[in-house]
A protein has these predicted regions:
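Active-site glycine-rich loops that stabilize anionic/oxyanionic intermediates
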Residues: 10-13, 83, 205-206
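Conserved alpha/beta-hydrolase
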Residues: 26-48
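Gly/Ala-rich beta-loop-alpha elbow adjacent to hydrolase catalytic centers
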Residues: 80-85, 89
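Flexible "cap/lid" loop of the alpha/beta hydrolase fold
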Residues: 97-134, 174-181
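Helix-rich cap/lid subdomain of alpha/beta-hydrolase
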Residues: 119-167, 171-173
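Short beta-strand/loop motif that positions the catalytic acidic residue
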Residues: 195, 201-203, 207
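Conserved alpha/beta-hydrolase "acid-adjacent" motif
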Residues: 208-217
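Catalytic active-site module of serine/aspartate enzymes centered on a nucleophile-bearing elbow/loop
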Residues: 228-264
């Protein structure tokens, strides 16, 4: 039986942006799916037309949503997530319900103190208005260019924005921003779990939304666990690395990591 793979997107990208990855992993012998977040419409057009469908959902809501999906699978899956999806991957890996995880440019979990200016600039899109906690928040093309497409040509960034950008709930950004002041923050991860599957963390050297300093600080959170945790940095790549012209390099590194640890 093929090992299931669950792809988890982050804020401002639709689940269908994973389709090239789904196809590649199926060709590699896995059984991949890319479910939407709770409330998420099936298409980009529907998501743009009804932003309220996702408003108000927080990290715990989304993590529990994916945990329920995993519970219905025939065996423990590999989970691969980008940005907030990378945080969700760590949540699910920490629960011990996955075979392995790949967290691509993951937003900071509770305990990570690094806060580069560029990351704060992106988060402020939602945080500047407390009312956004209960609303869906959209990016302008200019904001997408800074947060996702800064390592791309202006033309490619604009193309990706038009193809994949959607409104997303503001609540997760507030939960991540204030995690270190909240004892029961939903971004708290069981980083000490000694029996979990292997975890790969990645960063893009030019990422404005989740700069490498955040991912390096995340790796340190796992220092007390004997379980496998690895870090890979992709040079000259920004936050768009899962959807831009170089996505296959990131996907292949993910596949190689799984094969290296005999998860096929």
């Amino acid at each position: 039986m093929a090992t299931p793979v669950v792809f988890i997107h982050g804020l401002w990208l639709h689940a269908t942006s994973w389709q090239p990855w789904v196809d590649l992993f199926r060709e590699a012998g896995y059984d991949p799916i890319a479910p939407e977040w709770p409330g998420g419409p099936d298409t980009v057009a529907q998501a743009r037309a009804d932003p309220g469908a996702v408003a108000g959902f927080g990290v715990k809501d989304v993590a529990d949503h994916y945990a329920a999906i995993i519970a219905g699978l025939p065996e423990k899956p590999v989970v691969i997530g980008h940005s907030f999806g990378g945080l969700l991957v760590q949540n699910l890996v920490g629960r011990g319900i996955t075979a392995a995880g790949v967290a691509i440019d993951p937003v900071p979990i509770k305990g990570v103190l690094a806060l580069p200016v560029s990351a704060l600039r992106v988060a402020s899109i939602a945080l500047r208005n407390p009312g956004n906690r209960s609303k869906a928040v959209s990016l302008t093309a200019e904001q997408f260019r800074y947060g996702f497409g800064n390592a791309l040509s202006a033309e490619e960034s604009a193309e990706l924005y038009e193809k994949w950008a959607i409104p997303s709930p503001g609540r997760p950004l507030f939960e991540a921003a204030f995690a270190n002041f909240a004892p029961n923050s939903p971004t708290k991860i069981d980083t000490a779990n000694a029996t979990r599957g292997p975890l790969l963390l990645t960063s893009g050297s030019q990422d404005h939304t989740v700069p490498p300093a955040i991912v390096k600080a995340t790796l340190k959170q796992y220092a007390k666990s004997p379980a496998i945790t690895e870090l890979r940095t992709f040079e000259d790549r920004g936050h768009s690395l899962t959807i831009d012209h170089g996505w296959q390099e990131v996907a292949q590194v993910s596949l190689d990591f799984l094969k290296q640890h005999s998860i096929t």
